[in-house]
Regions:
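Membrane-embedded alpha-helices of multi-pass transport/permease systems
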Residues: 25-28, 32, 81-85, 119, ...
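Transmembrane alpha-helix signature in integral membrane proteins
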Residues: 35, 59-90
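Interhelical loop and adjacent transmembrane-helix boundary motif
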Residues: 3-8, 39, 52-61, 209-262, ...
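Generic hydrophobic transmembrane alpha-helix motif, especially the helices
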Residues: 105-143, 154, 195-199
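Transmembrane alpha-helices
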Residues: 14-15, 20-27, 155-160, 166-167, ...
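N-terminal signal-anchor/first transmembrane alpha helix
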Residues: 1-29, 102
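Short membrane-interfacial helix/loop motifs at transmembrane-helix boundaries
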Residues: 4, 25-59, 124, 219-221, ...
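C-terminal transmembrane helix and the adjacent membrane-cytosol boundary/short C-terminal tail
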Residues: 2-14, 88-90, 94-98, 160-175, ...
Length: 281
């Protein structure tokens, strides 16, 4: 079947430019105004790094940043482990009794409203506190557990899609040569799905760092995450420190994303070369 001819129209370019402008112009304005010396975020008064200094001297903001980064890193790591296990069970173990129910329970958080998830987890923690005395109070631990709950679903979907694309002949050949299933997974399967694991980890980290609704339900008075602090601040007006913080986050996310993309692309190319070399041999 011949490919359909590409219809060149100026309207397509206009729509594309408008779409990118709508997406990235606010970010550009945010970065520019983070260097504004004025206290009023909408009034330009000259270039300055004043608000970056104020940001690092704000103990409440730095505490919230540290808490959010810690929770996000720990939640993403646990979600990557649990999501990998869940994906292997869904894809490699095939049909078993209760497989449909298992897959539904793993992926249900994807379509569950955050309000429902947060409220249900709050009721669970309260009930456990009355029944067994744990958790004694809500804070970093309960936020971490809540984030692991919904992040695992996203990681499982990412990794399961990668597992379905793999050529199982290499795994079967290794088992024919006497390798145990556990050794095959760690030596062959895991390196091949590592780009998906890294992608799932980054996705879980971003979702955890960005979460406001669920964390608001399961946190206590002594645990304030960065989205909660920013949300409470902007309700009384945008603080220029928030512009500086958002600019730093954009920069870090961009650098980390580029490094992850580069490493995954290089790993994937090396994997393809190794497979081709093995088939020639």
């Amino acid at each position: 079947m011949n490919n359909l001819p590409l219809i060149r129209s100026p309207w397509r370019i206009v729509i594309l430019v408008l779409g990118f402008t709508f997406l990235y112009a606010p970010m550009l304005m945010l970065v520019i105004y983070s260097f504004n010396s004025s206290k009023l975020v909408t009034v330009w008064a000259g270039w300055s790094t004043r608000w970056y200094g104020e940001l690092f001297r704000d103990s409440a903001m730095m505490s919230a940043v540290g808490l959010s980064l810690t929770i996000a890193a720990c939640a993403a790591t646990m979600a990557a482990i649990l999501g990998t296990i869940a994906a292997v069970v869904m894809v490699r173990f095939g049909r078993f009794r209760g497989s449909n129910g298992f897959a539904f329970m793993i992926t249900a958080p994807l379509v569950m409203p955050d309000v429902i998830t947060g409220l249900s987890l709050l009721l669970l923690f309260v009930a456990l506190g009355h029944a067994i005395g744990w958790p004694s109070d809500r804070g970093m631990l309960t936020i971490w557990l809540a984030h692991v709950t919904f992040c695992t679903a996203y990681v499982a979907v990412v990794i399961s899609s990668r597992l379905r694309e793999l050529d199982r002949s290499i795994e079967e050949a290794a088992m024919d040569l006497g390798a145990t299933p556990l050794k095959v997974f760690f030596v062959i399967t895991l390196p091949m799905i590592m780009p998906a694991v890294v992608s799932g980890w980054l996705l879980a980290f971003t979702l955890s760092l960005d979460d406001l609704v669920i964390a608001s339900f399961v946190s206590g008075p002594g645990a304030t995450t960065l989205p909660m602090l920013v949300f409470s601040s902007v309700r009384m007006g945008v603080n220029p420190e928030i512009n500086a913080l958002a600019t730093l986050i954009l920069g870090v996310v961009g650098i980390v994303g580029f490094i992850a993309w580069y490493l995954m692309a290089r790993t994937e190319k090396q994997r393809i070369r190794d497979i081709q070399r093995a088939r020639r041999d």
